Each structure stands twice: as C-alpha cells, then as structure tokens.
C-alpha cells in the first residue's frame, strides 16, 4: 500500500488473529545464522522491509539465504567477507547498529548507510563503546549520524556501562565481543529486551547474565532452529484499540511475551483493561501465549522508570489509548522516542492535539487528560510506521470520522498486513 489513505473504519473490534513474526527476533535470526558454524532454520520470520534489509546485508557478507517450505534456511560462509558495495540498511536502525558491532571485528572495509530517515538517527552511542574495544569507526557530522565507515580489525574485550538502556547498543557490543580477545560485559541501568542473550545461548554461545550485567567471550554460534513468535509491538495496536473501544474483544494468538517486552501488558492492567493469557509456553527459548483484551472503563496511570525500555515502541499507541482513559496519564523517561524514525513525542503530540486530545508534551514524555472524544484529522505520518498505525487506531476512537494519513507506505517497514488485519476485526470496516 502506497500514498495517502483515508481511514473510515467503525468498531468495535472482535476476533482472533495472529500477528507477523517479531521484528527484533527476525533480525537476529538472520544475522546470528550468518555468524554460525552450521545452518540455521527459521520459522515465522517477519516478511517486512526492515528484515529484508538484514537479509540483503548478510548475503552481501557471504551468507546464503533460501526458502524451504515454511522455513528460511541461513547457510553461513566459512568466514564473513568484505562486502563488495555499500550496505544499505533501508529504514532499519537495528540492522545498522548490530552490523556495526559485527563488522568491527571482520577484516576489510564496510560502509553502512540507509534511507533519509535512518541517516538522521544517532550512531555515536554505538560508535563510542565499540571504539573502547579497539574498533576503527567513523560517521558523518562528527560521528553523530550515518553513514558509518567500519574498518575491521582485531578487538579486545571491554566492560561497558551504558547510561541509557538500549538493546541495540548492548547487542552491538556483545556481537563485537564474539570477535574480541577476552570477555566483553555490558551493564545497563535498566533491563532492555534480551533476545540477543537468549538466541546466542540457544546457539551454544556461553552467555553469563548477572542482574543487569551480560557477559560473553569469543565464540562462534553453532546455528540451530529459531521459531519466531508474534510481535507484541505489532499486536499493541489491536490490544490498545480493543481496550478503549466499547464492545471490543480481541485475541492475539502465539504472541511473544518475553518479560523484557511485556511492559504494554503491565500498562493495560494498570489502566483497568480486561486482559487474560492462555496457552502459555516456551518455544526455542522465547515465551509466548494467547493474549485476550476486552473493552473496559480505563483510568489514567503513571508510566516511567524501568518499564520504559519494555514498551518504548508501543508508547505511541498507548498515547492514543490514554485519550480515552478517565483522569491523567503521565509518561516520563521516554526521551528515546525523540530519536526514533521520527520525533515520536512531537509527531504524536501534534496529531493527537489536532484530533482534540488534551495533551501536554515534556522533553521526556507527556501528560494526557481523558476521556476526550477524538475527531477526524489529517495526519502527517513523517514516514514513521508507528505514527501511521497509531493514528489509524485513533480514527476508530473518533466515532468513525475520517482520518487521512498522508503516506502509509512506511507501514511496510514492520507490518505490511496491518490494514488487512484491522479490516478483518472491524464490524462495518472499510
């Protein structure tokens, strides 16, 4: 789907769905498979532009990726090779940052770039810790922005104490540590998503976790099988809509419920949503469950501190849901939203205010008073997939009034089937 889109759907939302595979796990399955000693078989890989970027990158480094039935098979090269051209990561910050860590220890010259949005996203936070390991890195605008030039060289292990919890920075350092001499440790102020640690351990890499510290030593993964659960960041749009839209009930099956990613479920519970889990199990090292949310009378809450890394990507649609909650919802410690694909605090604040929301922005968050009836509005998505999908949810809460999204091509970044699934859940949707 490309170009602008006029949303005129009507709720409630009712039904049972599966959302596509988790984007974070999909990236790692391809990349770790390319680093391995044997082939990796992946089931449920997300078919979206961000993951396509990682696939192209690992192929440029010598890996072979092929489809076999419902699985994707990653066959690693004997050793990663210098890419023959600039590696284009598209809109994927995960691809660029994790590859920066890997390529720091791979002999040769690599240049990592991306689209206009990615080239505005910060990379110094990755470059500085990798340099402490001996990496030879440079980037545009005083090492602040991509492209990133990597000259692979021998690395040494280091202890990194991060000021901001970031799974991407942590993962870049741990992956560089696989090529380094000695141990590499990352210490975070709060726990970020731990898919890297889980997958590396599942592929035979010794990983030591001690509270907020993670340590690896030089090793090469052995490959294996990865079964990707549904992405909770994608499910968030339907779960938040169901909680706020009277008469709604939505079940998302086979959903990833890794504890480092379930901040959204905690917030839904704190706001009074009717939420339940069933069929809880663990597959290939990742917890999953069927999650059901029913509409309820929501109330405001305070969101901040250690929970923020566990729901940072879901906060835009949480802001939409908060407009329908009685009382005041306050989000703090979320400054990271300002350096995503867009400044998501500014983008959502502007869009919701124009739709009639009572919202006050802070440097690191916002306060929203509710409940407030929303109205139709024209929205600048700023080429940000989560802004587009969040405001499609806002349209449902606007009593069927039209919301015009100026560009929805960005949704293909993470969730190409979003609008089709939304239509299937809507009664009288279009």
UniProtKB/Swiss-Prot annotation:
Annotated residues that bind phosphoenolpyruvate are located at 23, 93, 121, 168, 344, 386
Do you know which PROSITE patterns this protein is assigned to?
EPSP_SYNTHASE_1, EPSP_SYNTHASE_2
Write out the GO MF terms.
3-phosphoshikimate 1-carboxyvinyltransferase activity
UniProt: 3-phosphoshikimate binding residues: 23-24, 28, 166, 168, 313, 340
The active site lies at: 313
Q: Which pathway or pathways does this protein act in?
A: Metabolic intermediate biosynthesis; chorismate biosynthesis; chorismate from D-erythrose 4-phosphate and phosphoenolpyruvate: step 6/7
**What is the protein name stated in its UniProt record?**
3-phosphoshikimate 1-carboxyvinyltransferase
Any single Pfam family the record assigns to this protein? EPSP_synthase
InterPro entries for this protein: Enolpyruvate_Tfrase_dom, Enolpyruvate_Tfrase_sf, EPSP_synthase, EPSP_synthase_CS, RNA3'P_cycl/enolpyr_Trfase_a/b
């Amino acid at each position: 789907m490309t170009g602008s889109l006029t949303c005129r759907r009507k709720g409630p939302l009712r039904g049972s769905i599966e959302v596509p595979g988790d984007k974070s796990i999909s990236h790692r399955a391809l990349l770790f498979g390319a680093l391995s000693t044997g082939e990796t078989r992946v089931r449920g890989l997300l078919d979206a532009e961000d993951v396509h970027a990682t696939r192209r990158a690992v192929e440029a480094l010598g890996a072979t990726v092929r489809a076999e039935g419902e699985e994707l098979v990653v066959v690693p090269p004997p050793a990663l090779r210098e890419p023959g051209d600039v590696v284009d990561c598209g809109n994927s910050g995960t691809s660029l940052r994790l590859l920066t860590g890997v390529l720091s220890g791979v002999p040769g010259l690599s240049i990592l770039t991306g689209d206009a949005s990615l080239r505005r996203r910060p990379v110094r936070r990755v470059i500085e810790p990798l340099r402490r390991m001996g990496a030879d890195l440079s980037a545009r605008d005083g090492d602040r922005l991509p492209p990133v030039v990597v000259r692979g060289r021998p690395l040494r292990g280091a202890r990194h104490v991060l000021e901001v919890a970031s799974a991407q920075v942590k993962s870049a350092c741990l992956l560089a540590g696989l090529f380094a001499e000695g141990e590499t440790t990352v210490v975070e102020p709060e726990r970020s998503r731990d898919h890297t640690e889980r997958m590396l351990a599942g592929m035979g890499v010794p990983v030591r976790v001690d509270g907020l510290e993670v340590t690896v030593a030089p090793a090469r993964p052995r490959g294996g099988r990865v079964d990707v659960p549904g992405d909770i960041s994608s499910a968030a749009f339907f779960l938040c809509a169901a909680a706020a839209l009277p008469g709604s009930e939505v079940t998302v099956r086979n959903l990833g419920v890794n504890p480092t990613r379930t901040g959204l479920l905690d917030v839904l519970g704190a706001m009074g949503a009717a939420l339940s889990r069933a069929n809880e199990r663990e597959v290939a090292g990742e917890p999953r469950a069927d999650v059901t949310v029913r509409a309820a009378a929501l109330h405001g809450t305070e969101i901040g501190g250690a929970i923020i890394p566990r729901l940072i990507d879901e906060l835009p649609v949480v802001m939409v849901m908060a407009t329908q909650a009685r009382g005041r919802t306050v989000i703090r410690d979320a400054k990271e939203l300002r350096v995503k694909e867009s400044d998501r605090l500014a983008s959502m604040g502007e869009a919701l205010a124009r739709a009639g929301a009572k919202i006050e922005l802070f440097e690191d968050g916002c306060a929203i008073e509710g409940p407030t009836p929303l109205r139709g509005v024209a929205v600048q998505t700023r080429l940000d997939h989560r802004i587009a999908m969040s405001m499609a949810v806002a349209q449902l809460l606007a009593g069927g009034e039209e919301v015009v999204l100026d560009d929805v091509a960005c949704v293909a970044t993470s969730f190409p089937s979003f609008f089709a699934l939304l239509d299937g859940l809507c009664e009288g949707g279009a």
